[in-house]
């Protein structure tokens, strides 16, 4: 144990880990942008800018913040909830009578509600927008973990939400309940729309904390409350929680799991596992760059890995985050990553840039620490950070306990 006054209750191991993170925090790999609090989700907002230059993040401090990648300009919404935001979804609509655009940003929250931020523009979605509403509606009996926007066969846009309460629920974009689905699972981790399903029979897939992946066909909006939605047989490619689902351009499914693997599930082979990518810790997210044939994964060990999509071989590891990586998204040739360290970083997969990164990784002298990025944004209080970490560790401990139970 350390005998220094402020560190009396910390072990030598924890002190060494804190010192390691403090040293690593000074690096500028990935051109980091520091946010107010830990980041739990990220996504590209094509309604704001069709070029993909604007991403939004969901923060543990209760804020939704937009970032223009080309300028690092921030567009923060007013802080709504006093609890962490876990997930994002976007919806946009144009007025049939004028050039105005209405955009809604939805955020799932630990306060069991869905927060809605409505923005209005008369100059098109790539121009500046004015926030006209910040509100929420009660959605679940536990944390809201994931959101998706879907269009029903009768051409109505709806919100689908999943929660640790194990329910999938359906809402109008104005927050009116349309119905719910109660699969036999512990919690819902991720919701995605099958891009190869038809508009007349849209298919929704979702993953669970129990290991199962399910699919169902979305009925007309007026029939959701009365329809008996038929779930597919479960896809069981993993040993425990499946955190993320991602469809590549071929319509195959990629998964990220707490069993320390990412997997490629083949559509043409009944969603059987085509490839398994092993990791040293929980895999939090997965995405693909189909043009260049890469699979990108985010791991709890702070690293972003780039894999050869065809061979499954590890090609490169991007290092920069100094806490767990929580989310990924792709825009053009850029991989965007976010982390518990409250930074957003970007990594280029353009062939010349990726080759340069590989060469740097082979020469440690080229990766010496650089000046700490500027940070003039306030952070969570120590009390808030401790609470967030305790909740996340509790969730992870629960996962490990359930894994042990499943193995018995």
Per-range role (PLM):
Residues 2-26, 313-317, 322-326, 331-334, ...:
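Terminal intrinsically disordered, low-complexity extensions flanking WD-repeat/beta-propeller proteins
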Residues 29-34, 74-80, 126-128, 133-139, ...:
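Short C-terminal beta-strands that terminate individual repeats in beta-propeller domains
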Residues 31-62:
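Beta-strand-rich domains and repeat architectures in extracellular enzymes and scaffolds
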Residues 36-47, 82-97, 141-151, 185-197, ...:
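Canonical WD40 repeat/beta-propeller blade segments in eukaryotic WD-repeat proteins
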Residues 51-53, 93-95, 102-103, 156-157, ...:
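Short coil/turn segments that connect the beta-strands within blades of beta-propeller domains
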Residues 55-59, 105-109, 159-163, 204-208, ...:
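Conserved beta-strand element within WD40/beta-propeller blades
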Residues 61-65, 110-115, 142, 165-169, ...:
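Short coil/turn segments within WD40 beta-propeller repeats
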Residues 69-71, 119-122, 172-176, 219-221, ...:
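Short loop/turn segments that connect beta-strands within beta-propeller blades
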């Amino acid at each position: 144990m350390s005998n220094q006054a402020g560190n009396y209750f910390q072990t030598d191991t924890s002190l060494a880990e804190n010192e390691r993170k403090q040293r690593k925090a000074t690096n500028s790999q990935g051109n980091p942008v520091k946010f107010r609090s830990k980041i739990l989700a990220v996504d590209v907002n094509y309604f704001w800018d069709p070029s993909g230059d604007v991403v939004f993040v969901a923060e543990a401090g209760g804020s939704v913040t937009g970032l223009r990648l080309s300028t690092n300009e921030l567009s923060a919404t007013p802080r709504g909830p006093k609890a962490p935001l876990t997930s994002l979804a976007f919806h946009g609509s144009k007025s049939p009578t004028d050039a105005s655009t209405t955009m809604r940003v939805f955020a799932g929250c630990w306060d069991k509600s869905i927060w809605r931020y409505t923005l209005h523009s008369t100059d098109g979605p790539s121009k500046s927008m004015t926030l006209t509403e910040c509100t929420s509606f009660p959605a679940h009996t536990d944390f809201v973990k994931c959101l998706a926007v879907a269009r029903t066969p009768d051409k109505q846009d709806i919100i689908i939400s999943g929660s640790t309460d194990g329910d999938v629920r359906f809402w109008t974009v104005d927050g009116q309940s349309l119905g719910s689905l109660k699969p036999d699972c512990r919690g819902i981790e991720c919701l995605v729309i099958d891009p190869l399903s038809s508009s007349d029979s849209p298919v929704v897939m979702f993953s669970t904390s129990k290991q199962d992946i399910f699919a169902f066909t979305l009925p007309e909006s007026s029939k959701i409350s009365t329809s008996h939605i038929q779930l597919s047989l479960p896809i069981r490619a993993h040993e425990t929680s499946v955190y993320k689902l991602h469809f590549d351009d071929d319509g195959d499914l990629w998964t990220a799991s707490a069993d320390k693997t990412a997997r490629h599930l083949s559509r043409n082979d009944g969603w059987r596992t085509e490839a398994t990518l092993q990791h040293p810790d929980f895999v939090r997210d997965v995405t693909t760059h189909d043009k260049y044939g890469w699979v990108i994964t985010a791991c709890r060990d702070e690293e972003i890995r780039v894999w050869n999509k065809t061979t499954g071989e590890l090609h490169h590891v991007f290092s920069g985050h100094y806490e767990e990586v929580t989310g990924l998204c792709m825009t053009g040739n850029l991989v965007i990553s976010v982390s518990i360290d409250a930074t957003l970083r970007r990594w280029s997969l353009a062939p010349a840039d990726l080759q340069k990164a590989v060469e740097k990784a082979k020469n440690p002298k080229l990766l010496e620490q650089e000046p700490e990025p500027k940070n003039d944004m306030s952070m969570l209080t120590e009390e808030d950070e401790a609470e967030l970490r305790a909740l996340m560790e509790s969730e992870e401990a629960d996962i490990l306990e359930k894994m042990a139970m499943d193995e018995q």
